Design a protein with these regions (language model features):
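Active-site residues of response regulator receiver
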Residues: 233, 263
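Receiver (REC) domain active-site loop signature in two-component systems and cognate sites
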Residues: 61, 236
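Acidic catalytic/metal-coordinating carboxylates
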Residues: 206, 240-243
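Acidic, metal-coordinating helix/loop segments flanking the phosphotransfer/catalytic sites
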Residues: 203-229
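Short amphipathic alpha-helix used as the core "switch/output" element in two-component signaling
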Residues: 242-255
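Alpha4 helix (beta4-alpha4-beta5 surface) of REC/receiver domains from two-component response regulators
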Residues: 243, 266-284, 289
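Flexible, small-/acidic-enriched active-site or ligand-binding loops
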Residues: 37-53, 103-134
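Conserved acidic segment of CheY-like receiver
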Residues: 24, 172-193, 230
Length: 305
């Protein structure tokens, strides 16, 4: 939504969270993913689809898939009520509608106020919560909508096999830094880069951890040997990718390190923000093949210099 453009363009490390309810429980979504909210409409079922896929509907000439979020999260549909809402989203270059029971409001908070859930609750794997946020007096579960869609439609996420389409490749020794909070996506990106010949990869769970590492080596003469290029997501607990990009590009010792923002949120508005912050390139997930091509070009350009 429009107000989010003002928030993120300066790398303030803030997020606007839209709160909604499912069976009385509070959940949240980044407002940057939300196109609009509308009353639930009649949906045409799709045969042989995932249990959580209600079907399709067509508002204003745009065909949208509807995911029943109550069904996905709890296994129970409950009674579909006339007051149910559809949250229409835009991420990963897809428009998807999610059924919810009500929308409560929007809170502006710092990413520092969002904590990653304990992995012990999910057997060391990513759950469907990307973080737990304190919004006023309430604890709000921020859902990982990319993971939800990836589980329902795996073909829409990163495909390691896309690297094979790039042809034969040489091994590359440059040190790559990756800031990505999703365990699933970190593995997919890491496997893809390894297949592409990038064998020297250091990963961090959020922008804060990546920044602390970069700060710790910023004065070393071999800085660019240890951090040749940074790939960062945008949405991360503690410090987001826009804030990380801003800090790197404002630092005299780091500013020449290429920064690629690799996020599900990339659109024209986000592209403007990233450019203002100094990002060298911005790519939308799941374009992993294009990511490798851009990495090659940026690193080759730096080697020539």
């Amino acid at each position: 939504m429009a107000n989010t453009e003002i928030l993120l363009e300066s790398g303030t490390n803030e997020i606007e969270v839209m709160q909604f309810t499912i069976f009385g429980e509070l959940y949240g979504i980044n407002v940057a993913k939300v196109l609009e909210i509308m009353m639930a409409d009649k949906v045409k079922p799709i045969p042989h689809s995932h249990d959580a896929v209600e079907g399709i509907f067509k508002p204003r000439e745009t065909l949208l898939t509807v995911i029943n979020l109550p069904k996905y999260l709890t296994g129970e549909c409950g009674d579909k009520k006339d007051r149910d809402l559809f949250i229409i989203t835009n991420f990963n270059k897809m428009h998807i509608a999610f059924r919810v029971h009500s929308v409560v409001g929007i809170s502006r908070i710092s990413w520092e106020a969002i904590q990653k859930p304990d992995k012990a609750l999910t057997n060391g794997e990513d759950g469907v919560a990307t973080g737990i946020a304190q919004c006023g007096d309430n604890l709000v579960t921020i859902l990982d909508f990319e993971k939800i869609v990836a589980e329902i439609a795996p073909e829409t996420t990163i495909q390691v096999s896309d690297i094979d389409k790039l042809g034969d490749r040489m091994q590359r020794e440059q040190s790559i830094i990756l800031a990505e909070d999703s365990i699933l996506l970190t593995k997919m990106i890491s496997d893809s880069l390894l297949r592409a010949g990038y064998t020297n990869l250091t990963t961090f769970n959020n922008g804060r951890e990546a920044w602390e590492f970069l700060e710790s080596i910023r004065s070393e003469p071999d800085f660019y040997m240890r951090a040749a290029l940074l790939i960062t997501d945008i949405e991360m607990p503690e410090m987001d990718g826009h804030r990380l990009t801003k800090l790197v590009k404002e630092d005299e010792n780091m500013k020449n390190m290429p920064v690629i923002i690799f996020s599900s949120l990339i659109n024209e508005e986000m592209r403007v923000k990233g450019k203002q912050l100094g990002a060298d390139e911005q790519l939308s997930k799941p374009e992993i093949g294009r990511l490798v091509e851009v990495m090659d070009a940026l690193l080759d350009r730096r080697d020539i210099k």
